[in-house]
Swiss-Prot record:
Keywords per UniProt: Cytoplasm, GTP-binding, Hydrolase, Magnesium, Metal-binding, Nucleotide-binding, Potassium, tRNA processing
Enzyme class label: hydrolase
Residue intervals of the TrmE-type G domain: 215-376
Function: Exhibits a very high intrinsic GTPase hydrolysis rate. Involved in the addition of a carboxymethylaminomethyl (cmnm) group at the wobble position (U34) of certain tRNAs, forming tRNA-cmnm(5)s(2)U34.
Annotated compartments: Cytoplasm
Species per Swiss-Prot/TrEMBL record: Shewanella pealeana (strain ATCC 700345 / ANG-SQ1)
Binding site for Mg(2+): 229, 250
Protein name: tRNA modification GTPase MnmE
Any Gene Ontology biological process: tRNA wobble uridine modification
Residues at which K(+) binds: 225, 244, 246, 249
Gene Ontology molecular function: any one: GTP binding
Gene name of the encoded protein: mnmE
Length: 453
């Protein structure tokens, strides 16, 4: 970690009512003396002139000084809050840079200083960027929850439980005559099962948080001419796909990225699924299945004029059986304008069934509300936290080590191997908060931040 004193504009570039220059590091007091003529009283707003080297006034505004470690970065911090014209701010940065030993901050470097000085853990630092980039109230609230430590608290709790269990197992190993009794008395198994249950809950919440941040991938799939492209157009609000009465019109994957009340949704229209000898259509169908395998949700599009069935296993058992076991399915019975079906929403064999007319728009709004609900949209904006893909991967890795540990306990009564799996689980979880994290990963994370954060 560098000990350089860094400076950057903390407000967005361009014209604004207020512009803020932030300085962090040991030389912040030197900057204060050079630009202000004095060091402001700690944590007090000091209205004063900002002067150049000749003593001429560049601007007037508020100076704030925070003495480390009681600051955002943990270093001495000086903020100069002046008028928001870009020329004025550039002049002020130029003046600050005349003080020996300063340099311009890299993107995210103020937050990186805070992380390195234990003012934030890595999930909280990432939440700052997520809060800035939030595209909905739900995403903003979830990012704020992460910034305030909701995600971190759950991870720290898991790490503590895993560590305590590991110490208990290692204590049993230290007394080999009693090791088997320790491993078979039920206490370790009960603790391990409790941790597994806790981790499952955190994984579910994290997956929801990832969808709020990154969006949900929804694949529209079904037989040819079921109305898949019409539904894509209805959801997108524009004519993205060509629609004809000819079965097999869509031969490739079509993508649309939309927002429902600010929440990102990635909709994918696919070629109609059927047996075909057409080479191009075959490639399109293969691509459709590739998209289905990585989807968060499948909208199973059914032409309501061809069947009255609502159970997806009855409609097309081969299609349902081929889907990944963990993939959620929503049945969409289309062409309700022709069948005269009631637009009610029902449940069948564990699946939601929607009746719509993609052509006229009947029932599409209800389907949008359903998709918002699946993405975690909450009108009361309570609860939840933001999660990133790296968090999900770390949680999956931790879970796999726990499962291997259970096997070592239940099948082999192997205390040393159980302890090792618990150690690996602990390390995977600790990577989330940054306790065990490579410099390359830190660089990648913080370089995506705004300059000045």
């Amino acid at each position: 970690m560098t000990t350089d004193t860094i400076v950057a504009q903390a407000t967005a570039p361009g014209r604004g009512g207020v512009g803020i220059i932030r300085v962090s590091g040991d030389l912040a007091t030197n900057v204060a003396i050079a630009v202000l003529g004095h060091i402001p009283k700690t944590r007090y707003a000091d209205y004063c002139d900002f002067k150049d080297e000749a003593g001429e006034v560049i601007d007037q505004g508020i100076a704030l000084f925070f003495k480390g470690p009681n600051s955002f970065t943990g270093e001495d911090v000086l903020e100069l809050q002046g008028h928001g014209g870009q020329i004025v701010l550039d002049m002020l940065i130029k003046r600050v840079m005349e003080v020996d030993g300063l340099r311009i901050a890299k993107p995210g470097e103020f937050s990186e200083q805070a992380f390195m000085n234990d003012k934030l853990d890595l999930t909280q630092a990432e939440a700052i960027a997520d809060l800035i980039d939030a595209t909905s109230e739900q995403a903003a609230k979830s990012a704020l929850n992460s910034l305030q430590g909701e995600f971190s608290t759950q991870i720290h709790d898991l790490v503590e439980k895993v560590t305590n269990l590991r110490l208990y197992v290692e204590a049993a190993i230290d007394f080999p005559d009693e090791e088997v009794d320790f491993l078979s008395d039920g206490k370790i198994a009960a603790s391990l099962n409790g941790i597994v249950g806790k981790l499952d809950g955190v994984q579910a919440s994290a997956k929801q948080g990832s969808i709020i941040r990154e969006g949900m991938k929804v694949v529209i799939a079904g037989r040819p001419n079921a109305g898949k492209s019409s539904l894509l157009n209805a959801l997108a609000g524009k004519e993205s796909a060509i629609v004809t009465e000819i079965a097999g019109t869509t031969r490739d994957v079509l993508r649309e990225h939309i927002h429902l009340d600010g929440m990102p949704l990635h909709i994918i229209d696919t070629a109609g699924l059927r047996d075909t000898v057409d080479t191009v259509e075959k490639i399109g169908i293969e691509r459709a299945w590739d998209e289905i395998k990585t989807a968060d949700r499948v909208l199973f599009m059914v032409d309501g004029t061809t069947t009255a069935a609502i159970d997806p296993h009855e409609i097309w058992p081969d299609f349902i059986d081929r889907l990944p076991s963990n993939l959620g399915v929503t049945v969409v019975r289309n062409k309700a304008d022709l069948t005269g079906e009631d637009l009610s929403v029902t449940q069948e064999a564990g699946h939601s069934v929607y009746r719509i007319s993609a052509k006229t728009g009947l029932g599409v709004e209800d389907l949008k509300q359903h998709l918002k609900s699946l993405m975690g949209y909450q009108s009361n904006l309570e609860g939840g936290f933001i999660a990133r893909r790296r968090h999900l991967e770390a949680l999956d890795l931790a879970s796999s080590h726990l499962m291997l540990g259970k096997e070592q306990l239940e099948v082999y009564q192997a205390g040393e191997l159980l302890a090792e799996e618990l150690r690996m689980c602990q390390m995977a979880l600790s990577e989330i908060t940054g306790k065990f994290t490579s410099d390359d990963l830190l660089g990648k994370i913080f370089s995506s931040f705004c300059i000045g954060k």
